[in-house]
Amino acid sequence: VYKVLTVETPEGIVVDGMLQPTQEYADHLVNALGTNGIRTKKVLFTISSTRVASREVQIPNVKASKIEALVKTNASDYFPVDLTQYEIGHYLAGGLAENGKLRVMALAVPKALLNSYYQLAQMCGWEIECFDYSSNSLYQILRDEKSEKVTMVIKIDENSTIVTVLSAGKVLLQRTVAYGVQDAIDTMIASGAYAVNDPMSAVERFQKKTCLN
């Protein structure tokens, strides 16, 4: 990681991972990145959304080049939805199961969700290299942890929380809970106990002070 930048996003631009971009926001985003020396045209989006369905499955221990086709072939067994409205993806969930099969996390991502990112990329003049899912991004960071101890990692996003349980670099359990930091922000503002009236002030407050009773 060479540079990190946080750009405040107006209300309504992102709703549970789905983008509703405006040209004004796209221009603001490009200008903010450029001001901070980030001018690349190739981007990778990491998506966090409760609209994405995920399921751990076990498949025969085939070559890496054949996993995608195998997952897509069996997608209708994993996800009882109209698959014409979804893109199917996957990532390895950490080695082999006890029966010798590969542990794979299969994903079903709404095409409408992906299209909203293509829309933003077009507005910004970017080329999308690929998409990633937040739970996989988290696993890529954690998989080098070789501790034999069972460890729980909790990643809190805006509207959801990812709970990952690992041991020796392997995922034992991963679940997404439909509650995130926005719930805490709304509660802080509504309570009137913390003298905050907007989301950014609420975030700054609970970064500096324990706000749980």
Residue ranges of model-derived segments:
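Short glycine-/small-residue-rich flexible loop motifs, especially phosphate/cofactor-binding loops
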Residues: 30, 118, 185-186
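Helical mechanochemical/support elements of P-loop NTPase systems and associated helical scaffolds
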Residues: 21, 25, 67, 71, ...
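Active-site neighborhood for divalent-cation/phosphate handling
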Residues: 42, 46-145
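Short, glycine- and charge-enriched coil/turn segments that flank and shape catalytic ligand pockets
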Residues: 16-24, 95-101, 143-149, 196-197
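Non-catalytic, solvent-exposed interaction/assembly segments
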Residues: 1-74, 115, 149
